[in-house]
Curated annotation (Swiss-Prot):
Source species: Pelophylax lessonae
GO MF annotation list: calcium ion binding; identical protein binding
The name this protein goes by in its record: Calsequestrin-1
GO process terms (BP): positive regulation of release of sequestered calcium ion into cytosol; positive regulation of store-operated calcium channel activity; regulation of skeletal muscle contraction by regulation of release of sequestered calcium ion; regulation of store-operated calcium entry
Membrane topology: Peripheral membrane protein
SUPFAM superfamilies linked to this entry: Thioredoxin-like
Length: 420
């Protein structure tokens, strides 16, 4: 979580109630002024962990003396206070840990990244790597409160499972909840909860529909219809965890508000292949289907990972992205972005009538992976432009010098005439 995101989030909070009052049932919560966020110290951290089913801690850098730093911290606190108010009856607590004043308790709890939120539930610690806004944080914590494994008992639950295609998911078929193999599956689910959904069924008909054998676990990449079966069933917790770590970077993944920083930091050699497409837009939807087909065709390529961003999920970032990348987000785009300096190169799609075909997109991606398309080339072009500008300046200087010499000669001639 970075400073600008906090400012935008707080702005959203302040603007939420500027409109006319809604009817009963549609009123957004307003902060009631009660202090619920606690300062965590060596004296009270154990009591706080026992008191709350879920405890969310903001590990922050020391507050600066300047007005801007203090104002920003106040906005961060406001976000936490509103979230704490909304989730008060759910058994969720919120706290603050200063990285300097509370270094001892931070070390005991394993907090190491400033401006991050750490969530504690049972014996698990989850780092929240999403947008710092009250609504996104509340949604994430409600997911944390859910059980790590969701059961599929019939056709309706099965349909919901099949419709979930924009994030990785697992499903296993077990004898019952008392099965040792299910227990291992459940323990693995707790380690990835709530970022990766785990499903289980004890129903033979559901298992048959999914072509699952007893104690078998299938893993689905995002946007893939065909699963990968975890080998060597029945699987231990370690085998499941190791498998997911090996497959942690899907071929195509969606940038989501609740995990956006984690996704962005997981780059390949300092770059991301980024696709912008609005799913609700006809062109965006068509382009997304092309990208999905390319991803499924290349699912075995460990060097390929595409991040899909639906601009509608991040409306406050649209002007920034358009200015930074020099693209119009009302149209689909795919390009290479350097994660260090955000330099980018975008696939040429000037023809508004035709989107690239699957083959054309695969050829472009192949050029990217082979290094023929990269952001350094764009830098070289900029350098060439600068060199051209310098040459022009030199030419202008030479011309000016020549003009000055001519003027001097004219002056000398005039002086000679005067002497005569």
């Amino acid at each position: 979580m970075k400073g600008p995101w906090l400012v935008l989030a707080a702005l959203c909070l302040s603007l939420a109630n500027l409109g006319p009052r809604g009817e009963d049932g549609l009123d957004f919560p307003e902060y009631d002024g009660e202090d619920r966020v606690i300062h965590i110290s060596l004296k009270n951290y154990k009591a706080a962990l026992k008191k709350y089913e879920v405890l969310a801690l903001l590990y922050h850098e020391p507050i600066g003396d300047d007005k801007a730093s203090q104002r920003q911290f106040e906005m961060e606190e406001l976000i936490l206070e509103l979230a704490a108010q909304v989730l008060e009856d759910k058994g969720v607590g919120f706290g603050l840990v200063d990285s300097e004043d509370d270094a001892a308790v931070a070390k005991k709890l394993g907090l190491d990244e400033e401006d991050s939120i750490y969530v504690f539930k049972d014996d698990e610690m989850i780092e929240y790597d999403g947008e710092f806004s009250a609504d996104t944080l509340v949604e994430f914590l409600l997911d944390v409160l859910e059980d790590p494994v969701e059961f599929i008992d019939g056709s309706h639950e099965l349909a919901a499972f099949e419709n979930l295609d924009d994030e990785p998911k697992l499903i296993g078929y077990f004898k019952n909840e008392d099965s040792e193999h299910y227990k291992a599956y459940e323990d693995a689910a707790e380690e990835f909860h709530p970022y990766i959904p785990f499903f289980a069924t004890f129903d033979a008909k559901v298992a048959k529909t999914l072509t699952l054998k007893l104690n078998e676990i299938d893993y689905y990449e995002p946007f893939h219809d065909e699963p990968i079966t975890i080998p060597s069933k029945p699987n231990s917790e370690k085998e499941i965890v190791d498998f997911l770590h090996q497959h942690k970077r899907p071929t195509l993944r969606k940038l989501r508000p609740d995990s956006m920083y984690e996704t962005w930091e997981d780059d390949l050699n300092g770059i991301h292949i980024v696709a912008f497409a609005e799913e609700d837009d006809p062109d965006g939807y068509e382009f997304l289907q092309i990208i999905k087909e390319v991803a499924e065709d290349n699912t075995d390529n460990p060097d390929l990972s595409i991040i899909w961003i639906d601009p509608e999920d991040f409306p406050l970032l649209i002007p920034y992205w358009e200015e930074k990348f020099g693209i119009d987000l009302s149209r689909p785009h795919i390009g290479v972005v350097n994660v260090t300096d955000a330099d980018s190169v975008w696939m040429d799609m000037d023809d508004e009538e035709d989107l690239p075909t699957v083959d054309e997109l695969e050829d472009w991606i192949e050029d990217v992976l082979e290094g023929e398309v990269n952001t350094e080339d764009d830098d070289d072009d900029d350098d060439d432009d600068d060199d051209d500008d310098d040459d022009d300046d030199d030419d202008d200087d030479d011309d000016d010098d020549d003009d000055d010499d001519d003027d001097d000669d004219d002056d000398d001639d005039d002086d000679d005439d005067d002497d005569d």
